[in-house]
Amino acid sequence: MASSSRSEKRCHYEVLGISKESSPDEIRSSYRRLALQRHPDKLMKAAGLSEAEATAQFQELVHAYEVLSDPKERAWYDSHRSQILFADHSSAGGSKSGGSVPDLFAFFSPTVYSGYSDTGKGFYKVYYDVFNSVYLNEIKFARTLGLRMDSVREAPIMGNLESPYAQVTAFYNYWLGFCTVMDFCWVDEYDVMGGPNRKSRRMMEEENKKSRKKAKREYNDTVRGLAEFVKKRDKRVIDMLVKKNAEMEKKKEEERERKKKMEKERLERAMNYEEPEWAKAHEGEDEGAGLSELEEEDDDAKRKNEQLYCIVCSKKFKSEKQWKNHEQSKKHKEKVAELRESFTDYEEENEEEEIDGPLDSPESVEELHEKLQEELNIDNEERDVKKEVVGEADETDDEYFVAEEDMQGSSESEDEDDEMTLLKKMVSGQKNKQKNVVSKEEDEDETEVEIEGDTAEFSEFDNQKSTGRNKEAKEERNKQNAGNDMADDTSKVQIPGEGGNPDENMNATESASGALADSQKDEANSMEYDNRKSTGRRRRSKKGKDKNNQGELNEKSSEADDTQYVNRDMESQDYKKAPRSKKSTRGMKTKGTTKKNSSNECDRCGEEFESRTKLHKHLADSGHATVKSR
């Protein structure tokens, strides 16, 4: 019986006439070719076989193609091919290794059943007996080992063609997820108790565990593979798949019909639609709308092409999100703060230039020149008044003043020359500043060159002016003190004149005091103007840089023109020599020390004064002037 069963079994590759390395396309083409040759009708006519034999050969061909066309079944068949070919289906109730495990490989073939009945060799009878034997073996092993009865779940019944589909689903779900409770101790390779030492026994135990695990995994895979094999050929499952496919096709057809109907209705509504009058747009508006859309598209394209760029940090950004994150960064905020501070400093400097603006214009230079000339005229008038007052008081002392004027004439002329030189430099410097400002506005990007000569002249001029102001302030205090003394003694003392008229002497005294007060006011205004002017020069001296060599040539030519201009003005004016210069005080004192009588003591009354000015005022008021012998 066993030999006959083995002779009936053939390898699937042999049935299809292909090799084990054949591709799915080769398997398909071979099956189609053999299906035409081994059709039952052709076999009965050509070979003269019976209908049963012809049908059996054709079913063998179909079964081989079904197994090898499925990648999973083909892989499982390749790994268990020898066991399937040499297994005996009659040992299903028996066992291997002491009857513990039933032999299931013999049932991976359609030859074990005939028809789908639940009796005899029917499909449901044969496979029910196989799965029932597996379940009973699990119960027996659990009882032998003393395991709990709930460790083995109850298996659903396979049923027949009349069973509900829920029972079919439950049956296959149970066996597709099967897991045995057997430990497969009979597959041990080594006898652990016969080990010579502890280490060897431990190694034997490890090898036996691996063998048991492998046998258990193979048994579970065999049972699950058999369940999948049976499900694929179960007529109930096949009929349910056909039914489900028919329902799916029906639903798809209904969905297509519904969509067609909806599309048809939509087209009908669109054809019957009439636009109301208020919704009709004029052609011009449509064109305008089209142009606006094109402009919007162009703007969008420009925005895409535009790159986000941070001017402060000199960085480019690909997205607006990166740009916003950069604006919130600490480095960006610090650089923005620095830039804002630099802008603020620049604005403050511009405001300072605007405050000093009138000094930089040509009109301001002319006004400055006129004002300086007026100051010179006022100084000349003041000196004339002083000369008249002193001349009237010291008429008897002409020889004394003539000798003193001869000794001081040279120093006074030198002081006047120094003062005119400073005046020329000041006027020239003002015009040079105006041209520097204009050239700076026109050529902002050219190289800045510092004019050391002008800076040196301005610094020298400032030093001389500051020294002169200190001396003028000291003389002004002396004049104020002398003026107060003169005001107190005016009503008591008469200045002797040529005619000896007291009224004329009083008028001369009053005119002298008025001229002295006016000169003091003018000197105060002049000092305030000089202070403001020197402050503006110091503020602009930091920025007094020329732009190019042409600016230097223009400065030199303008300086020469200004010098000629000042000389012409000086020649047109009738300057009178002052009897005593403000800046000649040092020279006068130096020359005075060479005289025999260097003390400030009155020869007549013997009173000593702090300065020669007070001594002269005392001589003028008291008439104690005497003629000195040569």
Curated annotation (Swiss-Prot):
Bias kind Basic and acidic residues: ranges: 247-283, 319-328, 469-479, 519-533, 546-559, 568-577
Stretches the record annotates as Disordered: 197-218, 247-302, 319-604
InterPro entries assigned to the protein according to its UniProt record, in alphabetical order: DnaJ_domain (IPR001623), DnaJ_domain_CS (IPR018253), J_dom_sf (IPR036869), JJJ1_plant (IPR044648), Matrin/U1-like-C_Znf_C2H2 (IPR003604), Znf_C2H2_jaz (IPR022755), Znf_C2H2_sf (IPR036236), Znf_C2H2_type (IPR013087)
Cell compartments where the protein resides: Nucleus
Compositional bias per record (Basic residues), positions renumbered to this chain: 534-545, 578-594
Listed GO CC annotations: nucleus
Zn finger (C2H2-type) start-end: 308-332, 600-624
SMART domains in UniProt: DnaJ (SM00271), ZnF_C2H2 (SM00355), ZnF_U1 (SM00451)
Major subcellular location class: nucleus
Location of the J domain: 11-81
Biased composition (Acidic residues): 284-299, 344-357, 391-420, 441-460
Single annotated GO MF: nucleic acid binding
Taxonomic superkingdom: Eukaryota
Pfam families linked: DnaJ, zf-C2H2_jaz, ZUO1-like_ZHD
Keyword line: Metal-binding, Nucleus, Repeat, Zinc, Zinc-finger
Quaternary state and interactors: Interacts with REIL1 and REIL2.
Protein name: DNAJ protein JJJ1 homolog
